[in-house]
Curated annotation (Swiss-Prot):
Gene3D superfamilies: alpha/beta hydrolase. It catalyses: a carboxylic ester + H2O = an alcohol + a carboxylate + H(+). The keyword Heme does not apply. Its EC number is 3.1.1.1. Residues 1-16 form the signal peptide. The lineage of its organism: Eukaryota, Fungi, Dikarya, Ascomycota, Pezizomycotina. Keywords: Cytoplasm, Glycoprotein, Hydrolase, Signal. The keyword Cell cycle does not apply. This is Carboxylesterase patB. Substrate binds at S258. GO terms for molecular function: carboxylesterase activity.
Length: 555
């Protein structure tokens, strides 16, 4: 069986390396695989540079493709594996809340808050992670040996291996290309005599480095949505170079969860012109961003706070500071944000994002030929809506936070019509916290899958993941399942089914195959539910007036 050596599969670099690992000539450099995984039968090409270091004058600016020619052979060692990381402290409180809920034990919000913010001194940056660097615009390519041995395909020639590109989650402030181990997916792709698929993981700038925005920032020479521009350059790199690894540039699928899934939607609507994107298919899992949390004043305040924390008065001065100063300032800014608030992320900029991506999809400003597989979880918002929402006043404050960028009539409509204070079972909630959870799920994640399907003309497929606790991101361990030894808490039956569906979609554009339950072609009404109690077709919970309303709101 493919999963009998689960412990080795857990390490993508577990190596019984041949004496001469393969080398690929990218034009600007020659890059050698760092290892060969003898269990999974694939090569790992890690830390391939796809952009010049975003340092100095290139900070807060669009990425620049590599230029020149290096005479040396590189293998990716000694480089920054991840971009500077940060996490809002309130997420640590939420993790304690969801753990208590899962265990069925009481939760003391005030005690948890005190522990995180005071005892743990969460807002102060910890010692720098040696794998973290501003010079982080790299990608990893994992190539099955059978694919590599067939030789590189001629540029743009069809017939190469399918390619799965993964954009990580992390609320636009954390995460890296190395967070997930693709060994299980690669093994699944090699079943039934197939040569398998190529897997690519991408780093993109996070936090202040990738997502500052607003009038002051832009007028100072900053470029909003630099993180999206990084992703775009990496996807274009794949179109130009993946044939050198044996991949087919016309068979690229981009997959992402949460921030990664939200980014995919913005890549679909890039520039608002319906242009052909640098991929053929997408898999979006809980595609998330918070469209209503930004206002011009909030954007300017974030920028001012960032400069003040650096003790500078201009972006040019910030660009000249040492990296550790910027990294620490980024951490403090993100860590100290108000409870429940998304901090940094995509913003309407009149360029890459000319309008709300929700409305751009409604207006048909995405390429309709892209094939789509979507999913969301059954309890998306439970672990994200603040744990201290227990009464009408706290719910109203949350509405104000989530919809700060809208006018008062939208906030009133949300609180009285879409999510009224009715707890008799006639609404999909019975508590104030569940009411807030549904607001977040609809506004930030679940409904986005519906909008994406409606914007394309190709047959699409939709899944709901309801394996308990079915929280936001709880399907990720199933996607990257590596067998019962490596992942003993994962429902292996559901995980292997989900992996087969993903791999089939990557290969053929259709997730179905014998003997698995069929995922119906999405019609706006039904989808396939994956749960501990079975797999069945059921009504899509996004088929409601709430989702219809949020797509049309001006954020």
């Amino acid at each position: 069986m493919l999963f009998t050596a689960s412990l080795l599969l857990l390490l993508p670099w577990a190596s019984a390396a041949p004496a001469n690992l393969p080398i690929v000539d990218l034009g600007y450099q020659r890059h050698q695989a760092i290892s060969f995984n003898s269990t999974g039968q694939y090569y790992s090409f890690t830390n391939i540079r796809y952009a010049e270091p975003p340092l100095g004058s290139r900070r807060f600016a669009p990425p620049v493709a590599p230029h020149g020619r290096s005479k040396n052979i590189v293998n990716g060692t000694g480089l920054g594996y991840k971009c500077p990381q940060a996490l809002a402290c309130w997420f640590n409180v939420q993790n304690k809340f969801t753990s208590a809920a899962a265990a069925g034990t009481p939760f003391d919000f005030n005690a948890a808050y005190e522990e995180v913010y005071t005892k743990d001194a969460c807002t102060e940056p910890a010692k720098q992670d040696p794998l973290q660097s501003e010079d982080c615009l790299f990608l990893d390519v994992y190539v099955p040996q059978d694919v590599w041995q067939k030789g590189p395909q001629a540029a743009h020639q069809k017939g190469g291996a399918p390619v799965l590109v993964y954009l990580q989650d992390g609320a636009y402030v954390g995460g890296s290309k190395s967070d997930q181990n693709p060994a299980g997916l690669i093994a699944r792709s090699r079943e039934e005599g197939s040569s398998g698929m190529i897997y690519v993981g991408i780093n993109y700038r996070l936090g202040v480095f990738g997502w500052l925005s607003g009038r002051k920032f832009t007028s100072s020479g900053g470029k909003p949505n630099a993180g999206l521009l990084d992703q775009r350059l990496a996807l274009e790199w794949i179109q130009r170079h993946i044939h050198l690894f044996g991949g087919d540039p016309s068979r690229v699928t981009v997959m992402g969860v949460s921030a990664g899934g939200g980014s995919i939607i913005m890549q679909m609507t890039a520039y608002g012109r319906g242009i052909s994107p640098p991929f053929a298919q997408v898999i979006t899992q809980s595609p998330a961003w918070e469209p209503g949390t930004k206002t011009p004043a909030i954007e300017d305040d974030l920028f001012d706070t960032f400069l003040a924390s650096l003790n500078v008065t201009s972006l040019d001065q910030a660009r000249r500071l040492p990296s550790h100063a910027l990294t620490d300032a980024n951490y403090r800014l993100v860590a100290s944000r108000p409870y429940g608030a998304g901090v940094l992320g995509p913003a309407i900029d009149g360029d890459f994002i000319p309008d709300s991506p929700k409305r751009l999809l409604l207006q048909g400003k995405a390429n309709p030929g892209v094939r789509v597989l979507t999913s969301y979880t059954a309890a998306e918002g439970f672990g994200i809506a603040p744990a201290n929402i227990t009464d009408e006043a706290s719910f109203q404050r949350y509405v104000g936070l989530m919809l700060a960028g809208t006018d008062a009539s939208v906030r009133t409509h949300a609180a009285t019509v879409l999510y009224p204070a009715v707890f008799d079972g006639s609404m999909p909630y019975r508590t104030q916290h569940d009411r807030a959870s549904l607001l977040w799920a609809d506004l930030a994640a679940s409904c986005n899958t519906r909008y994406l399907h409606a914007a394309v003309r190709t047959p699409g497929y939709a899944i709901e993941y309801s394996v308990p606790p079915a929280l936001h991101l709880s399907d990720t361990p199933s996607v990257f399942y590596n067998g019962p030894v490596a992942d003993p808490t994962v429902n292996g039956t559901i995980a292997e089914l989900l992996q087969r569906q993903i791999v089939r979609f990557v290969k053929t554009g259709n997730p179905n195959g014998e003997p698995d339950p069929e995922v119906p072609v999405y019609d706006g009404r039904d989808l396939l539910d994956l749960g501990d109690d079975g797999v069945l077709v059921r009504p899509d919970s996004t088929d409601n007036a709430r989702c219809e309303y949020w797509q049309k709101v001006h954020f």
